[in-house]
Amino acid sequence: MAVPKKKTSRARRDRRRSHHALRGPGMVACPNCGEMRLPHRVCPECGYYKGRTVVAVEAVE
């Protein structure tokens, strides 16, 4: 069975993990209202998708 001959240092361990960081979601600006939204999804602010109204959004008073 394979066993490490030497202890892995903190620097070597951390260098190996340098690619493990998580990225945030890729957001795009809505062409209708300008709010940030997820791509290929209906805008939660205005309800538009691909240039037309898909969801009727209630106005907050």
From Swiss-Prot:
<comment type="similarity">
    <text>Belongs to the bacterial ribosomal protein bL32 family.</text>
</comment>
<dbReference type="GO" id="GO:0006412">
    <property type="term" value="P:translation"/>
</dbReference>
<keyword id="KW-0687">Ribonucleoprotein</keyword>
<dbReference type="InterPro" id="IPR011332">
    <property type="entry name" value="Ribosomal_zn-bd"/>
</dbReference>
<dbReference type="GO" id="GO:0015934">
    <property type="term" value="C:large ribosomal subunit"/>
</dbReference>
<keyword id="KW-0689">Ribosomal protein</keyword>
<dbReference type="GO" id="GO:0003735">
    <property type="term" value="F:structural constituent of ribosome"/>
</dbReference>
<dbReference type="InterPro" id="IPR044957">
    <property type="entry name" value="Ribosomal_bL32_bact"/>
</dbReference>
<feature type="compositionally biased region" description="Basic residues">
    <location>
        <begin position="1"/>
        <end position="22"/>
    </location>
</feature>
<feature type="region of interest" description="Disordered">
    <location>
        <begin position="1"/>
        <end position="24"/>
    </location>
</feature>
<dbReference type="InterPro" id="IPR002677">
    <property type="entry name" value="Ribosomal_bL32"/>
</dbReference>
<protein>
    <recommendedName>
        <fullName>Large ribosomal subunit protein bL32</fullName>
    </recommendedName>
</protein>
<dbReference type="Pfam" id="PF01783">
    <property type="entry name" value="Ribosomal_L32p"/>
</dbReference>
